[in-house]
Structure formats: structure tokens, C-alpha cells
């Protein structure tokens, strides 16, 4: 472990020099890749440096206690310092083990969040809207930027489908466990008999793809320009600003009319399409891999039911880790930290168990 840490420190110092090299700075793709690598190593190096200071404290305290000639007060102080340093050493060793776990290369990325109303008709579409609000409020609490990309709104205010770009530090690392089927149990607003119905919405979390990672060949792309049907203000009937893009090999389609200009809609459409197409091919590769190589939280199957939101009991249950919280109102208002932290800890624990086998 310590040889690995020394190697990491050496690489971190090398990256610092490279990132100040004018030749590297002028190469945007390489500069961004090296910046990400440096950011990924930063916590490891800082924790290891702290660990070395603790080892030094332990060594100094033991040496002074072994020399003798100390009064009782000094001995007591050194013993307390030694005990505290040893406890800190154990904690730092566990922290280092977690930091050295194989890291998902997408953890530092922004995400495209896609929510669809599934089983349950209008009620499922309304629940999709509830989930969208939950993620938006959570994003705001994290200081992330939340931007609607594409929305198919139902007549009663729900969403058949909605996509959002969430940008900020560590977005994917915190929200990657949200992909799957979310089930709601409640009395719908349209229910006159007061019966509880069960509906489902599906959530898909995709790491945002940057231009240097993937560019769709123009011959594989069909672009249609048309008049926006609502968003766009006064120019909806004057200028065709809405954009529809279809990736011909996969049939993946995106439509964008949220912005007031065709160019802005085109830019957002290609960003969303790039991410969806990249995710499509990546998922094919993941499906070929052994289950052990998928995330240890759940099966990795995007149709897997991951969570139930029970309104009559004010209960949220995450089925993958057996977590039940009587805090439905709080969670749907965006206070998701307890759920997300539990998923992260569970995933890390399982990975450590695999590592120690």
C-alpha cells in the first residue's frame, strides 16, 4: 500500500509540473485530462501526508517516553498524545484504503438526468415531476447548476419524459446510484374512492460526454428544424428555432425547443444526443461484462426496482441496501443526503470486502 502511495505522490508532483508547461496548457484535451488526474490524486496525497505526520508524532512520543527522566505531568501528556495519534492512525489507514479503491472514471463528471413516467399513466407522469423537483432541490443544496434540456409535459402538469443537465463538483459520484425504477404508493389526485395506487417512474443517470470524448459523424445525423410549439416567446410563429436530431445507426432522437434561438437549441441538442449515444454503446459493453464487474449497489439492471416512496406511511425504502426512512416529505423536498451517503458507504464496504478476499 505504501509503495503505491509513494508512487501516487511522485505522479502528483509530476502533474503539477506538466500543468504549468505552456505546451500542455495550449493542448485543451491533454490539459483537461491531466487536470482531472491531478484532482483525483489530490485527496490521496493530502491524506497520505497527514498520515506521515501522525507516524512522526507516534515515533517522537515513543522516543521521549523511552528516554526517561520525565516528570509525571509530562509522561501523562505524552501518553495521551500517543494514544490520540494511534487512534488517528487507524482512522487514516481506513480512509486511505477507501481512497485507493478503484475509482469510477466518471465520478467527477456532470450528468444528464432522464426521468420517464412509466407504469401508471397520469399518476406516473406526476410522480416523474415529483422526482424532478427532488433532484432539482438536492442540486441546489449542493451548489450545482440544474438546467432542463428536454421536456414532454402532460396536460395535468406531469412529465412523460424530461431531461436535465446537472453541473458541478462530483455530481455523477453522488447521483449515479439513482438509475432504476422508482415506485410510488399513494392516493392519486384523480382517485375519488381514496384508494392507494402504485405507479412507477424510471430514472437514468448518464455522465455528460465532452466533445473530445465523442463526436457523432455528420453522415450518421439527421437534423430537422421546425417551429417551436410553445417555448420561445414572440418568435415562435416567425422563426423556426426548434431542433430535432436523430442518430441514424441507433434511432436515438432528441428534440430541443427550450431556447429562443436555433443555435442554442442546436448546441443543447448535440450535447444531449452525444451523451445518449455514448451511453447506449457503453451500456452494450457493460451488459457483456460479468455481474461482478458492475456496481455492487444493485444488479446494474436499469429496469431494477430500486426504491419505493409510500405516502400513507411517509416512508422511503431503498431495496438494494434495506434502508427504510420515515422521512418521505423531507426526501422529496431534496434532503437526500442520508440516502445517498448510505449508498456510497454500502458500495465502498462491499468493494473493500472484495479487495480483502
UniProtKB/Swiss-Prot annotation:
SMART domains: PCRF
Keywords for this protein: Cytoplasm, Methylation, Protein biosynthesis
Localization, UniProt: Cytoplasm
Modified residues (N5-methylglutamine): 234
Post-translational modification: Methylated by PrmC. Methylation increases the termination efficiency of RF1.
Residue ranges of coiled coil: none
Molecular-function GO terms, alphabetical: translation release factor activity, codon specific
Family indicated by similarity: Belongs to the prokaryotic/mitochondrial release factor family.
Role summary: Peptide chain release factor 1 directs the termination of translation in response to the peptide chain termination codons UAG and UAA.
Protein name: Peptide chain release factor 1
UniProt gene name: prfA
Amino acid at each position: 500500500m505504501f509503495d503505491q502511495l509513494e508512487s501516487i505522490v511522485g505522479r502528483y508532483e509530476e502533474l503539477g509540473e506538466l500543468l504549468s508547461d505552456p505546451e500542455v496548457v495550449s493542448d485543451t484535451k491533454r490539459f483537461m485530462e491531466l487536470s482531472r488526474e491531478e484532482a483525483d490524486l489530490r485527496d490521496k496525497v493530502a491524506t497520505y501526508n497527514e498520515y506521515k505526520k501522525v507516524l512522526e508524532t507516534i515515533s517522537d512520543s515513543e522516543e521521549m517516553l523511552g528516554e526517561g527522566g520525565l516528570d509525571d505531568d509530562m509522561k501523562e501528556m505524552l501518553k495521551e498524545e500517543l494514544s490520540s495519534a494511534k487512534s488517528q492512525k487507524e482512522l487514516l489507514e481506513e480512509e486511505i484504503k477507501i481512497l485507493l479503491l478503484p475509482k469510477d472514471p466518471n465520478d467527477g463528471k456532470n450528468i444528464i438526468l432522464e426521468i420517464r413516467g412509466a407504469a401508471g399513466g397520469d399518476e406516473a407522469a406526476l410522480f416523474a415531476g415529483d422526482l424532478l423537483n427532488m433532484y432539482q432541490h438536492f442540486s441546489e443544496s449542493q451548489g450545482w447548476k440544474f438546467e432542463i434540456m428536454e421536456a414532454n409535459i402532460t396536460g395535468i402538469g406531469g412529465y412523460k419524459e424530461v431531461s436535465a443537465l446537472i453541473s458541478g463538483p462530483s455530481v455523477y459520484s453522488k447521483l449515479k446510484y439513482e438509475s432504476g425504477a422508482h415506485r410510488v404508493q399513494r392516493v392519486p389526485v384523480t382517485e375519488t374512492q381514496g384508494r392507494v395506487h402504485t405507479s412507477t417512474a424510471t430514472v437514468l443517470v448518464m455522465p455528460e460526454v465532452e466533445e473530445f470524448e465523442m463526436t457523432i459523424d455528420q453522415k450518421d445525423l439527421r437534423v430537422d428544424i421546425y417551429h417551436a410549439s410553445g417555448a420561445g416567446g414572440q418568435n415562435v410563429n416567425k422563426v423556426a428555432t426548434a431542433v430535432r436530431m436523430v442518430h441514424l445507426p441507433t434511432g436515438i432522437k432528441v428534440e430541443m425547443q427550450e431556447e429562443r434561438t436555433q443555435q442554442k437549441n442546436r448546441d443543447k441538442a448535440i450535447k444531449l444526443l452525444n451523451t445518449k449515444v455514448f451511453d447506449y454503446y457503453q451500456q452494450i459493453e457493460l451488459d457483456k461484462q460479468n455481474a461482478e464487474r458492475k456496481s455492487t449497489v444493485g444488479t446494474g439492471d436499469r429496469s431494477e426496482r430500486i426504491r419505493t416512496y409510500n405516502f400513507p406511511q411517509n416512508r422511503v425504502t431503498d431495496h438494494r441496501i434495506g434502508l427504510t426512512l420515515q422521512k418521505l416529505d423531507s426526501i422529496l423536498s431534496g434532503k437526500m443526503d442520508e440516502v445517498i451517503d448510505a449508498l456510497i458507504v454500502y458500495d465502498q464496504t462491499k468493494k473493500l470486502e472484495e479487495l480483502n478476499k
